[in-house]
Amino acid sequence: LDLTMKNNFSERRLKLSDKVLEDSAIIVASALVKARISDTDYAYRQDSNFYYLSGYEEPDSLLLIRPNSDKEKFIIFCRDRDPLREQWDGFRTGQEGAVQQYGADNAYSINSLDQMMPDLLAGVKNIYFSMSAPSGIDTKISQWMEDIRKNTRAGAEPPQNLLSLDSILHEMRLIKEDHEMNLMKKAADITTEAHIRAMQAVTPGMYEYQLEAEYLYAFNKNGARSPAYNSIVGGGNNSCILHYVENNDELKDGDLGLVDAGCEYQYYASDVTRTFPVNGKFSP
């Protein structure tokens, strides 16, 4: 991360810390890795809330924010460096990199999560986490709280309240910063270019997936590595199916083509729908 973005993420964490109750901990889990086939995963996309607060894009990670802590207010649990796995799957930041590059006060191995979290959460009154995230973090939190309860004789006090982080973060993300608006405009500009390219390329006899390819090319050429959602490219009757995604029929002379497609650029999505004649000529 450059210094500007590093500061932006830090400011977001501070703003969030001001919005939660005293004696609270904030837990945000990374998105899950999704297998495509036995030895290949789908392209990884970080959880939006996780990225918004850290800029960290690796899987198998967890953010812990403790606003009232004297020393370790922001902790990242992440994967260890592993030369063999990195040769196969790419570079890993590791704990040292998480501190130096992402501004964590400390970073620990994700393998030590279950061992360390009960101690880090003991004495905290409130735990905030996303109740809508499909990460299974709620089960983990219940496990950590039970581990704390087992040590109450040693003076450990378990958290009293589990609270939803969703509404607080959504309210924060609703108000866009200047650089966010620039990224949104960039996403819209790329999508505009893609729609113009498709309108110029469409011709009777093309298949819907070939027209879709014009969009994917324009997205990738401009640094938007994926569409924001499954593109809808339908000609004729298919254009009347609200969420048509097969995109495998021939585009015929005299038909209208409807395309609902937008790119995602650095976690910001665009969404544009246009309808135009397959033969390039509107009727009078």
List PLM regions with ranges.
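A composition/biophysics-driven feature that prefers long, compositionally simple stretches
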Residues: 1-193
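N-terminal accessory scaffold of Fe(II)-dependent oxygenases
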Residues: 125-128, 203-204, 211
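C-terminal helix-coil-helix/basic helical segment that borders enzyme active sites and/or dimer interfaces
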Residues: 196-206
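Short amphipathic alpha-helical leader/targeting segments
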Residues: 69, 198, 268-269
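Residue-level marker of positions within ordered structural domains that often coincide
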Residues: 68, 189, 196, 220, ...
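Short catalytic-site patches enriched in acidic/histidine residues
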Residues: 38-44, 146-151, 163-170, 175, ...
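Short, well-ordered alpha-helical packing segments
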Residues: 17, 33, 185, 192, ...
